[in-house]
Amino acid sequence: MKAKVGDWLVIKGATIDQPDHRGLIIEVRSSDGSPPYVVRWLETDHVATVIPGPDAVVVTAEEQNAADERAQHRFGAVQSAILHARGT
């Protein structure tokens, strides 16, 4: 696993009802991009030093933005379908 400042650390939820946890990598403690990373967690704004486990992935800011846009599109499509089903 390699990362750079500005990448996102995503910890996958263990089950379908658990959301992913996402944090912005604000410091990389090694010269080669390997862990540990200093991460600011999105949900809590808490800053912690993290050595990621096997349930973690590093994504670039561009990849995260694309994933966010896909999620917004899916949400909009579901919302539109609900409104259409209601007849409004």
Swiss-Prot record:
Q: Name one GO biological process term.
A: response to hypoxia
Q: What Pfam families does the record point to?
A: DUF1918
Highest taxon of the source? Answer: Bacteria
Gene Ontology cellular-component terms for this entry are: cytosol; peptidoglycan-based cell wall
What upregulates or represses it?
A: A member of the dormancy regulon. Induced in response to reduced oxygen tension (hypoxia), low levels of nitric oxide (NO) and carbon monoxide (CO). It is hoped that this regulon will give insight into the latent, or dormant phase of infection.
Query: What is the protein named?
Result: Uncharacterized protein Rv0569
Q: Which organism is it from?
A: Mycobacterium tuberculosis (strain ATCC 25618 / H37Rv)
